[in-house]
């Protein structure tokens, strides 16, 4: 008889905002590439008021300033603000590309099959097929996720305005559930995945089979934005750990992670010392200083101690009868 057991990976992941090592492979954050500029865009203000960004207790904790003004360059970094409509000018983009902008420019390409994914909260099957070569294909355990791929030498530019989801290895395309506002412009992202290894033992009546079979089951994919859209070969390249998009295999949805920032300094801090800690099965995100990193043994011991205390308290709770003994 065959038996199966899932060996989940550690519930804590951490990585710095720098790429762990320079490599051209496509695995995890080793594929961090690129630094580029957005296509020319126009910002239209709906309300004539100044922009002041405040960091509340939920988003940040530390000795940094709680309020600061944004300069013109940082305004371009603000995505999906309700006060603005972002419009692309294809003609201006073509002129900028022809003007010798270099490899850093991301050429704007109008999709003929474009369909907006903003505002959908449930799947909607479309009646056409897409050219999968024009999309980033993210293969998860329960589905395949497609995000439009603008042409770029580094192959890490994402257009979140057009996305599709299908059952694994099928061509039944539907619009995924979008649970948070998505960027309305091209951005560069580094991809990583979160999952576990499923280890299967062979049946007794098949002794010649391998002793076990291990399969990687990806439950979530994380897309982390490159800070200021810089390429990985840029000397100032870092990851913007505050902007992470999470694709969930089970719900076939995409959302933006809520990240807790404990590093002081606000948006103008030195991000090269940021360390992202992911816990609770890929649902909890926190940015700490790289100097506060714990070694894996300490983390495991702390988690086991917490779980042991909870299990013991649950057991002792069954033996207590305060509601009865208080009568005596």
UniProtKB/Swiss-Prot annotation:
A single GO CC term, please?
Answer: cytoplasm
Changes seen on gene knockout: Lethal without exogenous carbon sources. Reduced expression of plastid-encoded genes with plastid-encoded multimeric promoters (PEP). Strongly reduced presence of both plastid- and nuclear-encoded soluble polypeptides and polypeptides associated with the thylakoid membrane in chloroplasts. Albino plants unable to produce primary leaves white cotyledons that fails to accumulate chlorophyll (Chl) even in low light, thus leading to high nonphotochemical quenching (NPQ).
Entry comment describing in which tissues the protein is expressed: Mostly expressed in rosette leaves, stems and flowers, and, to a lower extent, in roots and cauline leaves.
Entry's transmembrane regions: none
In the UniProt record, the transit peptide is located at 1-59
- GO terms classed as biological process: chloroplast organization; plastid transcription; positive regulation of DNA-templated transcription; red or far-red light signaling pathway; regulation of DNA-templated transcription; response to cytokinin; response to light stimulus
Chain positions of motif RNA binding domain? 301-319
Q: Where is this region: Disordered?
A: 1-21
InterPro entries recorded: PTAC6
GO molecular function terms here?
A: RNA binding
> What keywords would UniProt list here?
Chloroplast, Nucleus, Plastid, RNA-binding, Thylakoid, Transcription, Transcription regulation, Transit peptide
Identify the main location: plastid
Q: Where is this motif: Nuclear localization signal?
A: 267-275
Task: Explain the induction of this protein.
Answer: Induced by cytokinin (e.g. trans-zeatin). Probably regulated by HY5 in response to light.
Subcellular location(s) per record: Plastid, Chloroplast; Plastid, Chloroplast thylakoid; Nucleus; Nucleus, Nucleoplasm
**What are the Low complexity biased-composition ranges?**
1-14
Record PANTHER family: EXPRESSED PROTEIN, PLASTID TRANSCRIPTIONALLY ACTIVE PROTEIN 6, CHLOROPLASTIC
Quaternary structure and interacting proteins, as annotated: Subunit of the plastid-encoded RNA polymerase (PEP) complex. Component of a large nuclear subcomplex that may include other PEP subunits (e.g. PTAC12/HMR/PAP5, PTAC14/PAP7 and PTAC7/PAP12). Binds directly to PTAC12/HMR/PAP5 in the nucleus. Interacts with MTERF5.
Described by its record, this protein's role is as follows: Essential protein involved in plastid gene expression and in chloroplast biogenesis. Links photomorphogenesis and chloroplast biogenesis through its dual localization; required for the formation of late photobodies in the nucleus, as well as for phytochrome B-mediated signaling cascade and subsequent reshaping of the plastid-encoded RNA polymerase (PEP) activity. Binds RNA via specific recognition motifs of viral origin. Recruited by MTERF5 to the transcriptionally paused region of psbEFLJ. Promotes leaf greening.
This protein is called: PLASTID TRANSCRIPTIONALLY ACTIVE protein 6, chloroplastic
Species per Swiss-Prot/TrEMBL record: Arabidopsis thaliana (Mouse-ear cress)
């Amino acid at each position: 008889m065959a038996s199966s057991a899932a060996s989940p990976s550690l519930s804590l992941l951490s990585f710095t905002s720098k790429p762990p090592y320079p490599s051209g492979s496509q695995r995890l954050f080793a594929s961090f590439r690129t630094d580029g500029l957005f296509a020319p865009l126009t910002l239209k203000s709906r309300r004539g008021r100044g922009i002041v960004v405040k960091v509340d207790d939920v988003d940040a904790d530390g000795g940094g300033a709680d309020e600061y003004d944004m300069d013109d360059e940082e305004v371009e970094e603000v995505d999906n603000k309700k006060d603005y409509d972002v419009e692309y000018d294809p003609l201006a983009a073509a002129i900028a590309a022809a003007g010798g902008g270099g490899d850093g420019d991301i050429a704007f390409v109008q999709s003929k099959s474009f369909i907006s994914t903003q505002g959908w909260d449930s799947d909607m099957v479309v009646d056409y097929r897409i050219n999968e070569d024009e999309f980033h294909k993210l293969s998860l355990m329960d589905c395949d996720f497609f995000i439009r791929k603008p042409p770029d030498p580094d192959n890490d530019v994402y257009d979140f305005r057009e996305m599709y989801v299908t059952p694994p290895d099928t061509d039944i395309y539907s619009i995924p559930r979008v649970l948070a506002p998505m960027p309305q412009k091209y951005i560069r992202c580094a991809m990583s995945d979160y999952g576990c290894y499923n280890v299967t033992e062979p049946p007794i009546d098949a002794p010649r089979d391998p002793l076990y079979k291990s399969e990687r089951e990806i439950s979530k994919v994380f897309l982390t934005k490159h800070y200021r859209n810089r390429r990985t070969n840029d000397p100032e390249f870092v990851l913007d750990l505050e902007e992470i998009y999470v694709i969930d295999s089970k719900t076939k949805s995409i959302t933006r992670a809520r990240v807790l920032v404990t590093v002081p300094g606000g948006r103008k801090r030195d991000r090269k010392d940021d360390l992202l800690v992911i816990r609770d099965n890929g649902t909890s995100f926190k940015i700490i200083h790289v100097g506060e990193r714990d070694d894996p043994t300490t983390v495991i011991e702390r988690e086991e101690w917490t779980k042991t205390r909870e299990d013991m308290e649950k057991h002792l709770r069954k033996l207590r009868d305060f509601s009865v003994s208080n009568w005596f």
